[in-house]
Design a protein with these regions (language model features):
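Conserved SAM/SAH cofactor-binding pocket of Class I
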Residues: 1-42
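Short alpha-helix immediately C-terminal to the canonical SAM-binding loop
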Residues: 18-19, 68, 95
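Short helix-capping segments at alpha-helix termini
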Residues: 27-32, 77-79, 106-107
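A short acidic, Gly/Pro-enriched loop at the edge of an enzyme's catalytic core
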Residues: 43-58
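A short SAM/SAH-binding and catalytic strip from SAM-dependent methyltransferases
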Residues: 57-70, 89
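A short glycine-rich, Lys/Arg-flanked "PGG" loop and its adjoining helix->strand segment in the class I
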Residues: 69-84, 99
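Active-site capping/gating segments
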Residues: 90-124
């Protein structure tokens, strides 16, 4: 939102993430009228998908490799054409496995980040 988006919808499986998202937005001067944060599983909850209001432009997953591998094929249909899937929290010993799973799910890894034994991938 600070980079120009008009609005945002965020969903996290962890209810604590909702409160943290609201706190972080407030610290950055972003009013609640510009975004919605929900707890739940957008992959299995049709009501959350409806509230999302269409495909996502950005999906972020900062979580362990096994979850990213399982999530990759399921999240693809929820994304708009050209959308970004940003994955992080990938330990170096699993990076190639995760990259392979992303590519097998139809993603193209456009950028790779590496820091202190951890990887991130920016995919489309």
């Amino acid at each position: 939102l600070l980079l120009g988006a008009v609005s945002a919808f965020a969903c996290d499986i962890d209810e604590k993430a909702v409160d943290i998202a609201y706190e972080n937005a407030a610290l950055n001067g972003v009013g609640r009228d510009r975004y919605t944060v929900r707890a739940g599983d957008v992959l299995s909850d049709p009501a959350l998908r409806r509230e999302m209001g269409g495909g996502a432009d950005i999906v972020a997953a900062n979580i362990v490799s096994d979850v990213i591998i399982a999530l990759a094929p399921a999240v693809r249909p929820l994304m708009n054409p050209g959308a970004i899937f940003l994955c992080s929290g990938i330990i170096d010993s699993r990076a190639e496995e995760v990259r392979g799973a992303l590519e097998a799910s139809g993603f193209t890894v456009e950028e790779t980040g590496r820091s202190e034994g951890w990887f991130s991938f920016l995919c489309r």
